[in-house]
Amino acid sequence: MEKVCKASDVPKAAMKGFTVKGRQILLANVNGSFYAVDAICSHMNGYLPSGKLEKNEVVCPVHRARYDLVTGKVVKNVPAVMRLATGGGAKDLQTFKVKVEADDILVDI
């Protein structure tokens, strides 16, 4: 497990991007529970921490693919016309185990 930040660095209903061991991850605080997933959208490499956090889902700022932060699964894919134009849609994100020790957030990368 790698220390990423302090719990206080990511307030409730917020998310931030971090680079851990060369990998870009998104860390989100959903009602005091922390979730970590890949920070890059699998559709066209949008930076998910710049997107929108809605409950336990993140919406990509580029083409609005929506991912579940708990499972990493695609909840809503990009529009069909966009999938046709770009050769495919969004794929599930990798999730990472998160542990809170005192005020430290640790992620299993």
How would you label these PLM feature ranges?
Residues 55-61, 74-83:
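Short cysteine/histidine-rich metal-coordination sites, predominantly Zn2+-binding motifs
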Residues 41, 60-63:
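Short cysteine clusters
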Residues 1-55, 68-69, 73, 86-109:
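N-terminal pre-ligand scaffold of iron-sulfur
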